[in-house]
Curated annotation (Swiss-Prot):
It catalyses: ATP + H2O + aliphatic sulfonate-[sulfonate-binding protein]Side 1 = ADP + phosphate + aliphatic sulfonateSide 2 + [sulfonate-binding protein]Side 1. This is Aliphatic sulfonates import ATP-binding protein SsuB. Pfam families: ABC_tran. NCBIfam families: PRK11247.1. The complex is composed of two ATP-binding proteins (SsuB), two transmembrane proteins (SsuC) and a solute-binding protein (SsuA). GO terms for cellular component: plasma membrane. Belongs to the ABC transporter superfamily. Aliphatic sulfonates importer (TC 3.A.1.17.2) family. InterPro entries: AAA+_ATPase, ABC_transporter-like_ATP-bd, ABC_transporter-like_CS, ABC_transporter_ATP-bind, P-loop_NTPase. Its EC number is 7.6.2.14. It is found in: Cell inner membrane. SMART domains: AAA. Residues 250-271 are annotated as: Disordered. It is a peripheral membrane protein.
Amino acid sequence: MTTLTHIPQGTPITLESIGKRYGNRTVLDNLQLRITAGQFVAVVGRSGCGKSTLLRLLAGLEAASDGTLLSGNALLSHAKDETRLMFQEARLLPWKKVIDNVGLGLRGHWRDDALQVLDTVGLADRANEWPAALSGGQKQRVALARALIHRPRLLLLDEPLGALDALTRIEMQGLIERLWQQHGFTVLLVTHDVSEAIALADRVLLIEEGRIGLDLAIDLPRPRRKGSAKLAALEAEVLERVLSPPQGIEASRQGIKASRQGTATSRRVAN
């Protein structure tokens, strides 16, 4: 297996007062975030909290309702060509062979580069096969190769391992971590798997009520040994916070409960 060469260093990111609304529904609310170049950040939170929305804003697929997205002193949109997004589904074109899926949209002499990135993810020998012949994990490796061929400085991962079996998922986690260590691009990983977030990231963010509710540095040496006491303690800390209702939601629940109790008391007095 060869390594991909000449990937530039990661993209630094600054989000200033980012808001995102869909009609009357606010998904992100005055979100503030700074990510240094080359950092590996995992984003967790309940379903519908805005994790994937954040990635779409960073990828330039949607525009923020409020605020500014920056890379250094320039708008992040200027780095769009150096940004790649991977989804839970590999999204390979079934009528194109593996190597052609990797080089999708490229012009000129790209086939040698495509073979190189396929070798990087361990699939050079499958270059001329059809996607239907690949397993789910292999399809995601092809999707990763398709991202790598563009020499990304920012890699956005939206639950790319969520549909894989446990063993394949661990293998893919190791591959992503090795490539990140070798090439230094910035990574944002959205995941529902807290153990995955702790195993891979330098930093874990929890989004709740449209804002960063927790920003936890994962100061553990790599490679991280699964089952270690420190890893388990961090997993428990993040999981407890994810499962705890945000203060605003809890206050709303208490208000509703008090209102109902007050109404019930009034009825008893009236009777």
